[in-house]
């Protein structure tokens, strides 16, 4: 199969996908209600889409093409409100977060869709363990070569995205000591990690053709990279975010991506090289493990600094681009919480210390997703 041509999209437009938990309101464990939710949601006219995911206790929502983080929030609000109404009819709840805190992976059932069944056959138990929940952000790129430059420039900020969205400290009722344990599950897949450092579409086509000749890859969907090109949309897709507990944070993260992308296009601040990736895995691990308390190694200088400080410096640096694109409020929210060391992983741990029972933590997380201020 040849690589699809890179389609035109309006630069800096946004699209957001969120994978969400469906839980029983009796015990707040995952509940196999995806099919029922999809049936109810089909009756509601909404922007974007609502589709099944790998197992039948999760669904994915997505916005349409948006021009700002406020438009993202507006569309997510419409979809969220419809989800909540449908869930109430089924006596279930919808919850954010990168992992469910106490579900047992072996109890999961693969959703009855050919691609999911194929993946289950190929990956075995990993498919059920893939009951994890991420946010994906698409950003429109002017052309194919610009998309690859954008992808590799964004790679320096992967630790930012991980720490700011981290919401998966618990796995099977245990505190993993990671802020984002979700990404450990992604690393188990053979085509995960990062894209090859090529900066022209012709080079990328050569790489893709070599991979397809091996028989290992049939399409771009087979790559589980942290960031991957999406030629059919004319975007790159950033895939490292945990699903936040609130749609407000999800929209703010999209605003941060858009502000970074605007800076890249306006100033071309640096040319990515293979050496950028010498510290990539280390920085990624630090952000997963320690969140906003991580150490960040600058790929260009080799300097070590607190990740929190690097995020705050970058937020200040892109502030004028945020203003141009209506993301100032989003960045203000992220700046305030970063300065306090506050992310969703910390909120979940604080609730657990106070409540003890993870089911109660999940119940309160469901209320936060509904828009309650807890």
From Swiss-Prot:
Top-level division of the source organism's lineage:
Bacteria
Q: Which SUPFAM superfamilies does UniProt cross-reference here?
A: Glutamine synthetase/guanido kinase
RNA-binding as UniProt keyword: no
EC code(s) of this entry: 6.3.2.2
Q: What top-level class of enzyme does the UniProt entry assign? A: ligase
One GO MF term on file is:
glutamate-cysteine ligase activity
Q: Name a biological process GO annotation.
A: modified amino acid biosynthetic process
Question: Which Pfam families does this UniProt record tie to the protein?
Answer: GCS2
Q: Does the keyword Ligase apply?
A: yes
Q: Which reaction does it catalyse?
A: L-cysteine + L-glutamate + ATP = gamma-L-glutamyl-L-cysteine + ADP + phosphate + H(+)
InterPro entries linked to this entry: GCL_type2/YbdK_subfam, GCS2, Gln_synth/guanido_kin_cat_dom, YbdK
What are the entry keywords?
ATP-binding, Ligase, Nucleotide-binding
Q: Which NCBIfam families match?
A: gshA_cyan_rel, PRK13516.1
Q: What does this protein do?
A: ATP-dependent carboxylate-amine ligase which exhibits weak glutamate--cysteine ligase activity.
By sequence similarity, the record places it as follows: Belongs to the glutamate--cysteine ligase type 2 family. YbdK subfamily.
Q: Cross-referenced HAMAP family, in alphabetical order?
A: Glu_cys_ligase_2
Q: What is this protein called?
A: Putative glutamate--cysteine ligase 2
Source species, please? Acidovorax ebreus (strain TPSY)
């Amino acid at each position: 199969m040849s690589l699809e041509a890179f389609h035109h999209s309006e630069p800096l437009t946004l699209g957001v996908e969120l994978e969400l938990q469906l839980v029983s309101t009796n015990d707040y464990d995952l509940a196999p209600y995806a099919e029922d939710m999809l049936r109810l949601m089909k009756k509601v006219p909404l922007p974007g889409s609502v589709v099944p995911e790998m197992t039948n206790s999760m669904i994915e929502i997505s916005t349409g093409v948006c021009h700002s983080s406020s438009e993202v929030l507006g569309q997510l609000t419409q979809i969220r409100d419809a989800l909540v109404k449908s869930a109430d009819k089924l006596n279930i709840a919808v919850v954010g977060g990168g992992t469910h805190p106490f579900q047992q992976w072996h109890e999961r059932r693969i959703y009855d869709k050919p691609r999911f069944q194929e993946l289950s056959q190929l990956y075995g138990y990993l498919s059920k363990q893939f009951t994890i929940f991420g946010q994906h952000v698409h950003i429109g790129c002017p052309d194919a070569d610009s998309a690859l430059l954008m992808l590799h420039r964004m790679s320096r900020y992967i630790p930012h995205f991980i720490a700011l969205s981290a919401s998966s400290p618990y796995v099977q009722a245990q505190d993993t000591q990671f802020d984002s344990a979700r990404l450990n599950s992604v690393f188990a897949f053979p085509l995960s990690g990062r894209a090859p450092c090529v900066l022209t579409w012709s080079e990328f086509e050569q790489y893709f053709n070599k991979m397809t000749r091996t028989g290992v890859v049939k399409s771009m969907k087979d790559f589980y990279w942290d960031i991957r090109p999406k030629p059919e949309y004319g975007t790159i897709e950033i895939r490292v975010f945990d699903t936040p507990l609130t749609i407000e944070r999800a929209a703010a993260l999209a605003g941060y991506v858009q502000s970074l992308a605007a800076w890249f296009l306006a100033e071309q601040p640096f040319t990515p090289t293979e050496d950028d990736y010498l510290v990539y895995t280390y920085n990624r691990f630090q952000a997963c493990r320690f969140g906003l308390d991580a150490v960040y190694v600058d790929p260009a200088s080799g300097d070590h600094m607190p990740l929190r400080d690097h995020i705050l410096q970058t937020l200040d640096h892109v502030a004028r681009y945020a203003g141009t694109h209506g993301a100032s409020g989003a960045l203000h929210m992220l700046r305030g919480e970063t300065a306090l060391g506050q992310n969703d992983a910390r909120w979940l741990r604080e609730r657990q210390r106070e409540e003890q029972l993870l089911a109660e933590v999940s119940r309160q997380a469901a209320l936060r997703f509904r828009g309650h201020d807890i």
